Amino acid sequence: MLFAALRDMQWRKRRLVITIISTGLIFGMTLVLTGLANGFRVEARHTVDSMGVDVFVVRSGAAGPFLGSIPFPDVDLARVAAEPGVMAAAPLGSVGTIMKEGTSTRNVTVFGAPEHGPGMPRVSEGRSPSKPDEVAASSTMGRHLGDTVEVGARRLRVVGIVPNSTALAKIPNVFLTTEGLQKLAYNGQPNITSIGIIGMPRQLPEGYQTFDRVGAVNDLVRPLKVAVNSISIVAVLLWIVAVLIVGSVVYLSALERLRDFAVFKAIGTPTRSIMAGLALQALVIALLAAVVGVVLAQVLAPLFPMIVAVPVGAYLALPVAAIVIGLFASVAGLKRVVTVDPAQAFGGP
């Protein structure tokens, strides 16, 4: 029966090719959507890792060192730096603002850190900012060394380029000295949003708590939670569409082969063998569509303006999902096979 199923697929190859390509496009888009949702976390992790900070110390009650931070004076910096387990400590700041580009504006995320860190990422061109009116800009902004940019209400000179530094769905990051950020965001008041630590403090002064890198990443992606959930809903809908496409083709094939199934039953072929042949068709379609989907995902990903980072687990899970979809999609056709009367084999045309 399996051979008969494969021969039937060969006979209907044009229909199967169209089905495989259509389902493959669905699989490819699902992978891309998965990569988009994961890309938000990948870019946030890249930003946090580039700072070289092991632990962020924030005020108690803060939701994170960046977007969920509570600004506080840096009066306890020396006490935190002197705690056992702390190798280095630096005052850090973070604020969202706008940058003017001619007559238009764009959002940027501003980070403040000492020139030599921790908290200041490595630059691919130029040097790290050392003065309040200097800035290291993300390479995604298209700026060059020596350019002047207007961030918030301040005009800053670009002295360094940080490679591909973005967060919050490709919003570029810019890095100032801590003093520069304080002038930009707090009118020069010595406020910070966190203390970046290299090492692991054994205890902290009262009124403070810590976030590790994972917690810092979660803080950066928190505003994107609704977007990620929306993407997940669309991905689920695409899986349903894939089931409907494969299921409709298998069901039509079953309807067209009712006389064949009746003949098979009349000559004593077990129903389970007939059902296995029909299920095989659905599995072959789904697995070939999965291969097409992987290829299409690689082609489509660079076309998106945001980071598409498809996790390895998604590629590994796709064949399994394809098998499940194939089996689920074949249910309607299998039910039709069970109800076929062998007497139809002896009926008229």
Curated annotation (Swiss-Prot):
<dbReference type="InterPro" id="IPR003838">
    <property type="entry name" value="ABC3_permease_C"/>
</dbReference>
<dbReference type="InterPro" id="IPR051125">
    <property type="entry name" value="ABC-4/HrtB_transporter"/>
</dbReference>
<comment type="subunit">
    <text>The complex is composed of two ATP-binding proteins (Rv0073), two transmembrane proteins (Rv0072) and a solute-binding protein.</text>
</comment>
<protein>
    <recommendedName>
        <fullName>Uncharacterized ABC transporter permease Rv0072</fullName>
    </recommendedName>
</protein>
<comment type="similarity">
    <text>Belongs to the ABC-4 integral membrane protein family.</text>
</comment>
<dbReference type="GO" id="GO:0005576">
    <property type="term" value="C:extracellular region"/>
</dbReference>
<comment type="function">
    <text>Probably part of an ABC transporter complex. Probably responsible for the translocation of the substrate across the membrane.</text>
</comment>
<keyword id="KW-1003">Cell membrane</keyword>
<keyword id="KW-0472">Membrane</keyword>
<dbReference type="InterPro" id="IPR025857">
    <property type="entry name" value="MacB_PCD"/>
</dbReference>
<dbReference type="Pfam" id="PF12704">
    <property type="entry name" value="MacB_PCD"/>
</dbReference>
<feature type="compositionally biased region" description="Basic and acidic residues">
    <location>
        <begin position="124"/>
        <end position="134"/>
    </location>
</feature>
<dbReference type="Pfam" id="PF02687">
    <property type="entry name" value="FtsX"/>
</dbReference>
<keyword id="KW-1133">Transmembrane helix</keyword>
<dbReference type="GO" id="GO:0005886">
    <property type="term" value="C:plasma membrane"/>
</dbReference>
<feature type="transmembrane region" description="Helical">
    <location>
        <begin position="231"/>
        <end position="251"/>
    </location>
</feature>
<feature type="transmembrane region" description="Helical">
    <location>
        <begin position="307"/>
        <end position="327"/>
    </location>
</feature>
<feature type="region of interest" description="Disordered">
    <location>
        <begin position="111"/>
        <end position="139"/>
    </location>
</feature>
<feature type="transmembrane region" description="Helical">
    <location>
        <begin position="16"/>
        <end position="36"/>
    </location>
</feature>
<feature type="transmembrane region" description="Helical">
    <location>
        <begin position="284"/>
        <end position="304"/>
    </location>
</feature>
<keyword id="KW-0812">Transmembrane</keyword>
<keyword id="KW-0813">Transport</keyword>
